[in-house]
Regions:
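Short acidic/histidine- and often glycine-rich active-site loop of Leloir-type glycosyltransferases
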Residues: 316-327, 331-333
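Conserved donor-binding/catalytic core segment of Leloir-type glycosyltransferases
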Residues: 149-151, 168-222
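N-terminal strand-loop element at the rim of the active site
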Residues: 2, 22-27, 45-82, 225
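Donor nucleotide-sugar binding/catalytic pocket of nucleotide-sugar-dependent glycosyltransferases
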Residues: 125-136, 143-182
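C-terminal "capping" alpha-helix adjacent to the active site of nucleotide-linked donor transferases
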Residues: 331-352
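A short, well-ordered alpha-helix in the C-terminal region of glycosyltransferases
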Residues: 345-373, 377
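Nucleotide-activated donor-binding/catalytic signature segment of Leloir-type glycosyltransferases, i.e.
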Residues: 221, 230-276
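Short hydrophobic beta-strand element within catalytic cores of glycosyltransferases
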Residues: 311-314
Length: 384
């Protein structure tokens, strides 16, 4: 079938996905990477399962079965973390040069403002997925291009951006998760916090909630703000398993978490976790705490908790009410006192309800369907 006829029939077969150069798009339980990387991985795998050819533009080694295109060559992670604005602009320009010589049906750019600007007026229909909040920088960049196509990752995030932006369809596609993730109703007597360690993520709040409830707390995540850690987190720790000399003890602790039964109240920091470790901690937690200090665009970790059968306790910010079913899969409130009270009510939550809610509303098949609908919409507009 000729390409133009195929596209007129809404048949999408050839997609380019663009990510930031430092992002590792890979599958496997041992990977340590953030929410955007996991979502893009799920999207690519879902598209490949629908017999859609996918080309990924990146600069970091990735282990995924799609076509990998390195416009500036392959760089190691340490170099990419120091990528400056000039190098990023060069990366974006080289992506555009390569894209202009290819016949993709659709280009899906995942978030980066510099790459977004570099892709303006390219002949292939292009949509940008916004993974981040409506900061001043993002609003100034994305809000100035009312003719471009966008998708948010929640209704709340969409509403936070300027109304003149051209959001396609409903304007958002929820992130998703593989519903084969591990589940357990064997909950142990600890609360869990998994996130980057920085003030906006609210580990300080989580410590207060756990302390006031008389419950143990396990904190996991990469430490981005050393001052915050030393001033607000470290003084409360009874064990720090993140240190290099503690790795054997740390592995044993996480692997045996299903038997967790401490003699005294503890607050434990385990450092950054990979997928397998996160699943282990998540599925046995009494509740997952998410008392963040910003308007949440989505929060992939919330659906990771739900699929594991673990209720979420969170501030009512951003997309939280779109993800948590109040009183059924967790609780959200406006103050620390609200969250302390809700944490004491976690026994009211059925683990199976948490999992079923996520499988019904946030599974990979739904996300891939909705992205394909977005692609068809912008292709149809382009060929009208």
């Amino acid at each position: 079938m000729r390409r133009e006829k195929r596209l007129n029939q809404g048949i999408i077969k050839n997609i380019a996905i663009v990510v930031q150069p430092h992002q590792e798009i890979s599958n496997g339980p041992d990977k340590k990477y953030g929410g955007v990387e996991r979502v893009v991985t799920f999207l690519i795998e879902g598209l490949l399962n629908r017999n859609v050819d996918v080309s990924l533009y990146t600069a970091k080694k990735c282990s995924i079965d799609c076509r990998l295109i390195y416009p500036m060559g392959l760089f190691d992670g340490e170099f990419l973390e120091k990528f400056n604005q000039t190098q990023l602009a060069t990366y974006s320009r080289k992506i555009r040069e390569d894209l202009e010589n290819k016949n993709f049906d659709v280009i899906n750019n995942h978030y980066d403002p510099i790459t977004f600007v570099a892709l303006q007026n390219i002949r292939t229909p292009t949509i940008t997925t916004l993974h981040g909040p409506a900061t001043e920088e993002n609003v100034n960049t994305f809000g100035g291009f009312s003719e471009c196509y966008f998708s948010a990752i929640s209704q709340a995030q969409k509403n936070s951006y300027p109304s003149n932006m051209n959001f396609v369809g409903d304007g958002f596609v929820y992130n998703s998760i593989d519903d084969n993730h591990p589940f357990s109703d064997n909950k142990r007597n600890y609360l869990l916090s998994v996130s980057r360690l920085e003030p906006i993520k609210g580990q300080k709040n989580a410590i207060k909630i756990a302390t006031m409830c008389g419950l143990d707390l396990i904190i996991a995540g990469n430490c981005l703000d050393k001052e915050y850690f030393h001033e607000e987190i470290r003084p409360h720790l009874t064990r720090d398993l993140s240190k290099p000399e503690k790795q054997s003890e740390r592995s044993e602790f996480i692997n045996d978490i299903s038997k967790y039964q401490p003699d005294v109240r503890t607050i434990i920091y385990v450092g950054e976790v990979n997928g397998h470790e996160r699943d282990q901690l998540m599925k046995h937690a009494k509740a997952f705490l998410f008392p963040i200090e910003v308007e949440e665009s989505f929060g992939l970790v919330l659906i990771e908790a739900g699929i594991a059968g673990t209720p979420v306790i969170a501030f009512n910010r951003g997309a939280i009410p779109e993800i948590i079913e109040q009183g059924k899969t967790g609780f959200f409130g406006n103050t620390i006192d609200d969250l302390i009270g809700f944490t004491k009510r976690t026994s009211e939550i059925n683990s199976a309800d948490c999992r079923e809610h996520i499988k019904k509303h946030f599974n990979n098949e739904i996300m891939v369907d909705r992205y394909l609908n977005l692609y068809r919409t912008i292709v149809a507009a382009n060929y009208a």
